[in-house]
Amino acid sequence: MLQPSNRKYRKDFKGRNRGIASRGNRVSFGEFGLKATECARITARQLEAARRTIARHIKRGGKITIRIFPDKPITKKPLEVRQGKGKGSVEYWVALVQPGRMIFEIEGVDEALAREAFSRAAAKLPLKCLFVKRTVM
């Protein structure tokens, strides 16, 4: 599963996930993309499950590019522990995703196969997604 190898600080503030994606919102590396249409926190496990689904569906056909990275640590205190005594330990990692952000890209497969692979992967993710094609300018 994806997680940063080293960070300056182990724990983050909670923060808010607002706005729309101004960067990473175009198909850059492949021919087809899976684009987020709402805000969400995607965990490293969800991302890996979606990636495996795509890889299994396209078999050895194309190349998959993951455009997001889970770099935000989410902490949790153990069960039945009173409040106070500092922040809990890191439980898992998430990627904050805004509407318009590209999540996955595929190249080297036909459109029907890519569309089906992305629809199966979108079922594993906690947000609504859209299938997009690369536009040539």
UniProtKB/Swiss-Prot annotation:
Alphabetized NCBIfam families for the sequence: rplP_bact (TIGR01164)
Keywords of the record: Ribonucleoprotein, Ribosomal protein, RNA-binding, rRNA-binding, tRNA-binding
InterPro entries on file: Ribosomal_uL16 (IPR047873), Ribosomal_uL16_bact-type (IPR000114), Ribosomal_uL16_dom (IPR016180), Ribosomal_uL16_sf (IPR036920)
GO molecular function: rRNA binding; structural constituent of ribosome; tRNA binding
Subunit record text: Part of the 50S ribosomal subunit.
GO terms under cellular component: cytosolic large ribosomal subunit
Function: Binds 23S rRNA and is also seen to make contacts with the A and possibly P site tRNAs.
Biological process per Gene Ontology, one example term: translation
Name this polypeptide is given: Large ribosomal subunit protein uL16
Family per record: Belongs to the universal ribosomal protein uL16 family.
Pfam families per record: Ribosomal_L16
